[in-house]
């Protein structure tokens, strides 16, 4: 019980810190990840990673009807923390993310680079006690890796338009875009 109380307190303090940081950075422009041409004829993004080689992600796991949402890393982290510490998908604090048992596997996948881009996380919005939060169908550890490495903006996958719009409103940096339209744009690159 005491351990759970400590986790709640640490998460609450982190949310407060993030609220201040997000308020201070409000209105500052964030760059979208760059889409790069590739041999697979699929959408692949180059994500700048501070003090590390760039990371590469792909929409190869997306259906044509799915949507891509570019999320602000800090806002996304805050929304994931809002899920609560008791939830099975609870967000660890950034400093604890590398301790996750699957983290080394995600790190290894990101380390391969452009030759094997990492699939996007499949994310859904939810409300917890009146607060916006995010939950996952797939990609929690990939998201931990991005957050632990301070990636400012990254794409996530959303399976329907209403969810994509809600994600974009709360944690997004641009309007959502349907995968079919994005793939069409990529063919023109």
Swiss-Prot record:
InterPro entries: FiwA/Osa, PFIN. It holds the Pfam family PFIN. Keywords: Plasmid. Suppression of A.tumefaciens oncogenicity. This is Protein osa. It comes from Shigella flexneri. The gene is osa.
